[in-house]
């Protein structure tokens, strides 16, 4: 039987079967045993996204825990290709990375790929991608990272420090390998052909194992790193993979910045949030109130419930009650959507306040914090 979904770094289509994807990508499932080990390591409760299998797959997370338990530590790496506006789905890896930093007390490196964004789109100027970088950095800082253990860097600014190591990496990679992984062809400009080498450099910022929290669609990018890392004297990058927060329009695919009806943007005001949720959020309810009261709704396909489950309702008892009431028909679709609207608007209001304060912290994360100052003194070879 043909597979009815597609997951690549540049395209997600259909309703994703995550168990099949683990087999297809050759990753490992986040088992209950592994989660218990993580819980013991931090001596605290796990993040809601771990408890509820939003982060469901990994490569070498067991080795990360081994290193941590032995006192060797690890570091975190994530990044962002800047865009005109970030949506809720873009925040998931950053929120989880911040939690990992807080609980394991480790360094975080956040790469802003203003160069890649410029190279990939013929219509974008470098000034545009640099401007978007600043705006996106404000949203990232607002998540709450430790300013002395986090280094946020733009490729066009930090390139001198990374270039020697990126050249060594580039020499290990053939165009054939890069072409298949990054969706390139003979019409691709030579800048984007070189870029994958630059993306690998931060996985080698420390002589420790690197953990990358990201969407499962990003996994293929790091296979190249894992193929060459040990030959350069570094560890293979470990990853922990998240599922996709479903688009408002239904359980298939993922949110898209180019389709406003699929996403809630961090800049959406309360009325826009309410309008989008009420109009576009795919419902698992029945066609009429009478039928819904009689047969109940299906939270498994209901986007409002899925957003609450994956992100916005961390209280396990509360989410169970919402699920029970919706399945039984005691809670209507409109009531479920209103819960999400209220949660979303509270979250976005707090985010906007933190984002405003982040304007005073940009230079700390990029240049003046403890980790940032140390990184600007280093040339990576």
Swiss-Prot record:
Q: What class of enzyme is it?
A: ligase
- Residue positions of motif 'KMSKS' region: 254-258
Give the residue ranges of motif 'HIGH' region.
82-90
What does the record list as GO biological process? tryptophanyl-tRNA aminoacylation
What reaction does this catalyse? Answer: tRNA(Trp) + L-tryptophan + ATP = L-tryptophyl-tRNA(Trp) + AMP + diphosphate + H(+)
Which Pfam families does the UniProt entry name for this protein? tRNA-synt_1b (PF00579)
Q: Which GO terms describe its cellular component?
A: cytoplasm
GO terms for MF: ATP binding; tryptophan-tRNA ligase activity
Q: Which Gene3D superfamilies match?
A: HUPs, Tyrosyl-Transfer RNA Synthetase
Name-wise, this protein is: Tryptophan--tRNA ligase
Q: Which species is this record about?
A: Sulfolobus acidocaldarius (strain ATCC 33909 / DSM 639 / JCM 8929 / NBRC 15157 / NCIMB 11770)
User: The organism's lineage?
Assistant: Archaea, Thermoproteota, Thermoprotei, Sulfolobales, Sulfolobaceae
